[in-house]
Amino acid sequence: MIRKHSLGFVASALALAVSAQAFAGTVTTDGADIVIKTKGGLEVATTDKEFSFKLGGRLQADYSRFDGFYTKNGNTADAAYFRRAFIELGGTAYKDWKYQINFDLSHNTGSSDNGYFDEASVTYTGFNPVNLKFGRFDPDFGLEKATSSKWVTAPERNAAYELADWINTHQDGMGAQVNSTLADMAYLSAGVSAKDADDSDGDSVKQFNFRGVFAPMHEAGNVLHVGVNYAYRDLDDTAFDSRIRPRLGMRGIATSGGNDAGDNGNRATFGGVSNSPAGSYKDDSVWGLEGAWAMGPFSAQAEYLARKLKADDNAYKDIKAKGYYAQLAYTLTGESRQYKLEGAKFDSVKPENKEIGAWEVFYRYDNIKVEDDNVVADTATREVGDTKAKAHNLGVNWYVNDAVKISAAYVKAKTDKITNNNGDDDGDGFVTRLQYVF
């Protein structure tokens, strides 16, 4: 029933956006005049900028094929699914209050109990340049996470984030954040979140995030960006899932919503267990570094993170992990990646030629390592010692226009001390995406 009503809402919203084409322009009222824009969704705003309303969305349809380590038996499997299907509603109220609601119809974010919200937040901007944000949103950690999923270069973000997926996902929690730009060359943010998990007393897990970026050059085609990140969560007396289970660039092995490889998908556990009991671990912390440089159509970026899950019982050992990625991208048609200092992030590539669009090629190298000394005996798929993985990502993006993007990427993964059921320690995958945003 919920899905039926959701689809009805989407159809109505799209019909409203289309019908509004006939009314685009300025409407005179007995109060402030209203400006209606229909390029890229439906946007309505008063001329005094006191109020605004924008209806938009994003649709990402993916298809992937993969084999080797990516499947349990090593044979080829595939997956066709909506990676994201967002309806987005945002705007301004009384000039200084901003709101944003993103609902995921593909059910890849959120949950049935808490709603499939990618974001539901309110931001107060009256202390310019300081912003205060409240609600459900992803904590701020990392350049690639700060960049919208619409405009990240590869179909999936880097594998290093999967070493500690809690650092920049809301996990059905609520949070508060303060952020600001400084002297037209820096960005700072700090936040606290109450996650959906509770300790033995029913007190929610608290998480703290900090991100600082220095970007003295921050224009399209002229970017210099360096930053540091820190995330911490208190796990005292908390039972939780401590598994580290990277997908290594192939979402299709196990999607949160939609078709995947089913029981044959191999989302292997590199460290941790599914049911770490209360009292086993005290806290969890992650440090991160990020850097980027762009000149004209060329861009390079890299990130590094190190995690320590600290044991609180002599029966358990600390779990440590570290990882990094390095990425190069070049737009063959000459366009530059856009960049925004507010949020310290890359943005879209805007095609200059409306007939051929913009063509971008990229390469990314991912490398991760997990040290879990709680593993003291070999199993059929995991040896004692540090598990490792590396992945090569080679792909192309075609920005057909401002709304449509088509992507294709080949991923080659190699692991150490961990295999699938067939003994494979490498795998190949190919993923394509059709994206439409409005």
UniProtKB/Swiss-Prot annotation:
<feature type="signal peptide">
    <location>
        <begin position="1"/>
        <end position="24"/>
    </location>
</feature>
<dbReference type="Pfam" id="PF07396">
    <property type="entry name" value="Porin_O_P"/>
</dbReference>
<keyword id="KW-0813">Transport</keyword>
<dbReference type="GO" id="GO:0015288">
    <property type="term" value="F:porin activity"/>
</dbReference>
<dbReference type="GO" id="GO:0009279">
    <property type="term" value="C:cell outer membrane"/>
</dbReference>
<dbReference type="InterPro" id="IPR023614">
    <property type="entry name" value="Porin_dom_sf"/>
</dbReference>
<protein>
    <recommendedName>
        <fullName>Porin O</fullName>
    </recommendedName>
</protein>
<dbReference type="InterPro" id="IPR010870">
    <property type="entry name" value="Porin_O/P"/>
</dbReference>
<keyword id="KW-0626">Porin</keyword>
<dbReference type="GO" id="GO:0046930">
    <property type="term" value="C:pore complex"/>
</dbReference>
<comment type="similarity">
    <text>Belongs to the OprO/OprP family.</text>
</comment>
<keyword id="KW-0812">Transmembrane</keyword>
<dbReference type="GO" id="GO:0006811">
    <property type="term" value="P:monoatomic ion transport"/>
</dbReference>
<keyword id="KW-0868">Chloride</keyword>
<keyword id="KW-0472">Membrane</keyword>
<keyword id="KW-1134">Transmembrane beta strand</keyword>
<keyword id="KW-0998">Cell outer membrane</keyword>
<keyword id="KW-0732">Signal</keyword>
<comment type="function">
    <text>Anion specific, the binding site has higher affinity for phosphate than chloride ions. Porin O has a higher affinity for polyphosphates (tripolyphosphate and pyrophosphate) while porin P has a higher affinity for orthophosphate.</text>
</comment>
<keyword id="KW-0406">Ion transport</keyword>
<keyword id="KW-0346">Stress response</keyword>
